[in-house]
Amino acid sequence: MAAHTRRPRALKLAALALSLLAAACSLVKSVETPLDSQEQAARWVREGKHAEAAQAYAKLSVDAPAEHDNYALLSAEQWVAANNIVAAKQAFGTLSPEARSKLPVARALVAAEIAYAENNPAGAIHELDQIAVPTVPDQAQNYYWIRGRSAFLTGHAYEGTRALVERERFLSDAGALRANRDELLNRVRGAAEHGQSLKYPAKTETVVAGWLDLGTVALELARNPLHAQGTLAAWKRQYPQHPANDGVLAVAQTQVSIATEFPDQIALLLPLSGRGESIGVAVRDGFIAAYLQQGAAGRPRLKVYDVAAESLASAYNQALSEGAGFIVGPLTKEDVAALAPLSNGRTPVLALNFLGDNVSAPRNFYQFALLPEDEARAVARRVVADGRPNGVALVPTNEWGARVSAAFADELKHLGGSILDTQHYDPSQVDFSDAIKTMMQVKNVKGEPVTHRSDANFIFVAGSSSGASRLILPQLKFHYSGDVPVYSTSDSFEPDSAANSDIEGMTFPDMPWMVASDPVTVQIRDSVRQAWAARTTRRDRLYAFGFDAYRLVPALRSKPPGEESPIAGVTGKLHLDEHNRVRRDLDWAQIKNGQPAAL
């Protein structure tokens, strides 16, 4: 939760009495007075030392019992700002019963802050509903800040936008206004990204309507800037006086300009014949689909080289001699390893696989890959974040399974979790009963209730194909283990499958292309499927891979995306690590009624 710095409430009568007492005592010896402590606490608030301020206010609540509730609320508020919600609740819990009537506004605001920090936005709104809108500017802006963000989190974008727009009436500082508008832009874009309704009543004021209409535009600016210029221009014609034009959109337009500045010529090196043809063609098609999203005037020249028909070295040198300003490819791990020592360091390369872990990338040599190990690590982080650090794993007996299992186990151990048991299965078989019963320690004694181990709070099913997972999950339920949450990788999910009901309840990470329902991703996905109607949708992830590879070219030439400013790609949120590898943060979904529901 964002920290809010506010001037502590003045306790005029008590402060005056205490200051007089302190002055009298100073004739004998120097002592620290409550007023001194209050000033010190206020100084810590201004300096952003929220934990220190919280402790000081807590001490004041004891030292000045007549003002206990006021100081306890200030302490709780600062603990929230310090992101220590346990301490905040403890301080809040010391309030007297009279605080509800004596300090209704302050009490409700702090209670709402605590609820919001605990991911309970509905609870935050409930607390705010107990009071009238504050008239004190400081309290009013905090009221609308909490109410607006809570409304967005409960899926009410219209109400959230109204609240944050109303908040601006109580903001006089230019920096605070800009921060509020940045928040509005992020919130309406997030609402669009999560498929929330951005509709509004017919007589909605223009500023509110403009923000809501900007949601999808902002998402397109982030996820598909190649196609966004026309959409943005149309919005600006409709809302020429909108406050978003004054700052936040200028930054967005600068980012779009950077995201569409391509070299004059790009070379794409892929296997388009032989053993790797089907994968190479799918990546090429996705790359070209992104290329076609861009207006013809802004497109670079694109030359495609089949590295299966000629040597990699020959294709690379030919691309350079023919004027390539950026190389994308090759695709296989072997070819990427072979290209690295050939790279001249001047012409940037985006390899579509990773070098070995102990191999340093040459200068201007970037790497992008769709690795199951990355998903396995993401699952490990998720189970720990969900409060389920200990569990069991079921993995296939093949090289893919070994890689995924090792990555999952390493990340889980690093985070303090543990795998209680790992069982292996043959993906060519259909009956996995023995592995499941051993893994879950199923006990089925005649005349007694069937039981399974109680120490496992998750089951990780590594499915190298969606077919295996669709067989495993029903068998888990058959063997009385359906009450334990199941996590898997994206390989377990295929879109548009009637058999997805067999993996009901499964939680998994996947790229937005596969699970997002926002209008921008749907437009991209539909345009690719229409352009390559004869291709199978089983190659969707490879289309997305090619699409994002094209998106990465201008970013890597100018300002490579960091973890704090990732690219909103269709394969995930993309950022570059210290080894010049593009990393992906994935979306999360759970199968509900046979369909992926965003988490």
Label each region the model flagged.
Residues 320-332, 349-352, 390-396, 446-468, ...:
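Periplasmic-binding protein-like
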Residues 102, 278-283, 293, 297-358:
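Beta-alpha junction/loop-to-helix N-cap segments that form part of ligand/metal-binding clefts
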Residues 158-252, 257, 262, 299, ...:
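Extended repeat-based interaction scaffolds and adjacent low-complexity, acidic/S/T/P-biased segments
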Residues 22-40:
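Bacterial Sec signal peptide processing site at the extreme N-terminus
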Residues 527-598:
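Segments of small-molecule ligand-sensing domains
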Residues 26-31, 58-67, 93-103, 129-138, ...:
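Solenoid-like repeat scaffolds
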Residues 370, 456, 473-545:
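Extracellular/periplasmic periplasmic-binding protein-like sensory domains
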Residues 365-424:
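An alpha-beta-alpha
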